[in-house]
């Protein structure tokens, strides 16, 4: 049994969310997995995500490769088509304990390979970010947006 390896690409929110996912994965007992938290802000960011996934597969041939983050949210079919990728998880799903519970060795074969919901259907505040509300600064999940449906959000 080995703890999951996490690779974070992109913004500070991704770094914060990677730490939250690390806790969720540990609590669920996920092992022998590599999680890539991607960025989609530019085409170059998506290209680097694919490059990182290929490198991680070479370095970890027996691990389950799980791709999440904004690039996985916006291009799930692209990442699902990569032979190196075992699972694609959307931005909403990556923060749900049930998603990580389904990634344990005894359940991994019984879960959907691609779990990406429409982010515009999200109607609740990201619970893992609420701790930051009492401070002067907080992280805002641009990829999930808000209920105002601005065109700024992905």
Report residues per predicted region.
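Proteins enriched for Cys/Gly/acidic motifs involved in redox and nucleic-acid/cofactor modification
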Residues: 1-154
């Amino acid at each position: 049994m080995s703890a999951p390896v996490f690779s974070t690409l992109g913004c500070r929110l991704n770094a914060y969310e990677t730490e939250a996912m690390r806790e969720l994965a540990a609590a669920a007992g996920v092992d022998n997995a590599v999680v890539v938290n991607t960025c989609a802000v530019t085409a170059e960011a998506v290209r680097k995500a694919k490059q990182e996934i290929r490198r991680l597969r070479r370095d970890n041939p027996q691990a389950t490769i799980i791709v999440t983050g904004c690039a996985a949210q916006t291009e799930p079919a692209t990442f699902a088509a990569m032979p190196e990728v075992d699972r694609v998880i959307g931005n909403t799903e990556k923060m749900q304990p049930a998603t990580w519970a389904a990634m344990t060795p005894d359940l991994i074969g019984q879960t959907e390979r691609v779990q990406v919901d429409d982010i515009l259907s999200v109607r609740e505040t990201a619970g893992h970010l609420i701790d930051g509300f009492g401070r002067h600064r907080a992280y805002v999940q641009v990829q999930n947006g808000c209920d105002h449906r601005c065109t700024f959000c992905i």
